[in-house]
Structure formats: structure tokens, C-alpha cells
């Protein structure tokens, strides 16, 4: 009999997709036929003449399942959507597509929407979907502060008996013992079991060079030879001597500055921890900079945005990046398998 697990979260960008990818790949490795589904998608992009849910496409591709897994996508402002759709029609679309996706599967992992409350107005919030699909629920809590415990308890009120298991994600090291002690006691009293606490990993919160190029709407002057991750951004509005100090202290840095700052760019290219250069204002550098960047394998991105706008765009996507590309998938799998009790999840689902 097919089993269903809905992975929900108390807030957006909690790491649901990464956990689903790691769990799905582990279950498949153990011999289970794994399906993937998402009822409501809000991060939509245009493919041809239709809107599709980008996050679910990426996750489905990594899991090696069919990619058309999200029957309801937000293709207009939410208030317009909520006042123009028929919840009965939406629920039927969800059930029909889930029936197709689940055929021949031992287990289907369902990804919740932005957070467990999203979709209440149209009747396909996570709790409603879990009830429709007779799913068990695994809740992900991003440990930004101690108040996440209150958020988890509020979610328990919404899900009721469907929710029994919790994973905390992106936990700072000093909070791990707190979770094992106080938080576990409080949640156990509410009928919740913490099955994992995944530590924060700066690489997972970082950006690939391609994600940086997309964020600043740039073009490559020097393309990356391999996938590199950027964890910090350094703004080059200073002398080369001052910048040197910041670049030395930065981890896997991207330098953002104008293409006319040849002295600064050449200094940055001497630093082994500089992962890419982002040149603003459509100012191309002198050939010496490009030649040296090519020699050292440092990608160079040119954008029409000014430095402030480029940095603002990067700040808006740091920590909200997707788990894609072999390096991130590998790290997420290792963290998941080291810090989450997979056996307990399997028993929770009733898988043989």
C-alpha cells in the first residue's frame, strides 16, 4: 500500500526542498519506488505560454521523477487568484494529479507550500492537502531563534494528529544542545517527536556563480570552468589596500565593483578565496584583468546595474537559494543522513 509523507514548514525558505531531496534519494537507495508531488506552487516562471512552479521542477529533476508534479500554480496576484478560483475545482485537480503521480509508488513525498498556512483562502493549505491525501506530516522548523518552538506548537494545532515528527534545520552549533534538552521536552509534551536537528552549513546558504549571474541579470565575460560556491560578497568601494583586508577575511568571496577599478580587480585576482568578479555599470575592464582572470579560472560577470543595486539583489537571494548542483546535493545528503533519524521516519510511514 502506497504511503504519503507531506513535508511542511513554519515559514518560507526553511529548507523543505533540500530535506525532501535527501530523504527521497535515501529511500530510493534503499529500494523504494519514490514519487514527488506539490499541490500549490507560488514561485512560478513562464515556460512557453504557461506558468510552471520552478522549485518543484528542480526537485523533480534531481529525484529523477516526472516533472509535471504541481497541478495548481499561482499565475497572478494571490488576492486575484483567491477571489477568482473555485476551491472545489482546485481540490479535484490536486487529487487527480496526485493519483497519477502516486501510481506504482511505494511512497510519495509531498512538498508543502511556502508555509503551512499558505493556501487557506482557497482550501489547499498544507493541513487540508494532508487530510485529502491521508498523509503523515513531517514539519521543518528553521531555527532562527527560540520562538520557532511556538511556531511548531501552533502548526501542531493546525495539523492535529497528522503531525507527529519535526526536523529543525539550519541550527547554529550552540543551539544543538538546547534542542536536545529544553525544546525536545516541550515538544514531547505536545505529542511531537524531534527526529533531527540539521546544523547550518554556509555553503548551502551560498550562491553558485550561475545563481549570482541570474540575480544581477548579468552576462559572462569569463565563464566558470566548474561549479563554484560564493558565501560572502565584498563591495569594492575602497582602496586596494583596504579591500585586501576584507578579502583575506572573507570566505569564498565575490567582489562587486566597477570595471574601471583595474587596481582593485588585479589585487582581488591574487586572492585564492575570490570565487568571482562582478563588474557593475556595464564597465568592461582592461584586457589584462580578463587575461589574468582566465588564467586563474575566476569567472567575471558584467551587469548594467550599479554597485548598490547589484549588492541589494544578491542580499535578497542569499539564504534563499535552491539545492541544485552536485556539490549542494551531496552536502545536503551528508547532513541529512548524519543528523536525521531516517529509520524513525520509515517506521512513522509504516514502510516495510
UniProtKB/Swiss-Prot annotation:
InterPro entries: DRTGG (IPR010766), P-loop_NTPase (IPR027417), Phos_Acetyltrans/Butyryltrans (IPR050500), Ser_kin/Pase_Hpr-like_N_sf (IPR028979). To Synechocystis PCC 6803 slr0039. This is Uncharacterized protein AF_1212. It comes from Archaeoglobus fulgidus (strain ATCC 49558 / DSM 4304 / JCM 9628 / NBRC 100126 / VC-16).
Amino acid at each position: 500500500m502506497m504511503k504519503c509523507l507531506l513535508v511542511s514548514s513554519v515559514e518560507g525558505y526553511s529548507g523543505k526542498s533540500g530535506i525532501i531531496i535527501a530523504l527521497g534519494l535515501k529511500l530510493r537507495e534503499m529500494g523504494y519506488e519514490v514519487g514527488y508531488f506539490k499541490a500549490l506552487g507560488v514561485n512560478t516562471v513562464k515556460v512557453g505560454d504557461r506558468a510552471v512552479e520552478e522549485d518543484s521542477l528542480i526537485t523533480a529533476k534531481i529525484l529523477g521523477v516526472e516533472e509535471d508534479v504541481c497541478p495548481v500554480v499561482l499565475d497572478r496576484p494571490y488576492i486575484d487568484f483567491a477571489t477568482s478560483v473555485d476551491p472545489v475545482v482546485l481540490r479535484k485537480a490536486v487529487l487527480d494529479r496526485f493519483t497519477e503521480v502516486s501510481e506504482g509508488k511505494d511512497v510519495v513525498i509531498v512538498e508543502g507550500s511556502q508555509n503551512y498556512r499558505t493556501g487557506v483562502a482557497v482550501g489547499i493549505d498544507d493541513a487540508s492537502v494532508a487530510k485529502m491525501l491521508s498523509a503523515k506530516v513531517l514539519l521543518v522548523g528553521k531555527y532562527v531563534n527560540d520562538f520557532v518552538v511556538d511556531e511548531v506548537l501552533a502548526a501542531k494545532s493546525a495539523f492535529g494528529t497528522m503531525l507527529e515528527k519535526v526536523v529543525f534545520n539550519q541550527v547554529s552549533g550552540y543551539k544543538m544542545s538546547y534542542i536536545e534538552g529544553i525544546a525536545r521536552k516541550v515538544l514531547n509534551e505536545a505529542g511531537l517527536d524531534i527526529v533531527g536537528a540539521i546544523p547550518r552549513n554556509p555553503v548551502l546558504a551560498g550562491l553558485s556563480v550561475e545563481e549570482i549571474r541570474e540575480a544581477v541579470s548579468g552576462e559572462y565575460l569569463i565563464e566558470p570552468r566548474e561549479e563554484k560556491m560564493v558565501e560572502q560578497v565584498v563591495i569594492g568601494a575602497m582602496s586596494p589596500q583596504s579591500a585586501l583586508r576584507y578579502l583575506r577575511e572573507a570566505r569564498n568571496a565575490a567582489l562587486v565593483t566597477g570595471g574601471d577599478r583595474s587596481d582593485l580587480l588585479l589585487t582581488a585576482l591574487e586572492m585564492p578565496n575570490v570565487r568571482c568578479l562582478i563588474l557593475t555599470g556595464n564597465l568592461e575592464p582592461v584586457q589584462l584583468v580578463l587575461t589574468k582572470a582566465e588564467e586563474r579560472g575566476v569567472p567575471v560577470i558584467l551587469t548594467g546595474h550599479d554597485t548598490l543595486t547589484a549588492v541589494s539583489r544578491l542580499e535578497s537571494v542569499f539564504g534563499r537559494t535552491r539545492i541544485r548542483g552536485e556539490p549542494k546535493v551531496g552536502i545536503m545528503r551528508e547532513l541529512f543522513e548524519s543528523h536525521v533519524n531516517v529509520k524513525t521516519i520509515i517506521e512513522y510511514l509504516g514502510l516495510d
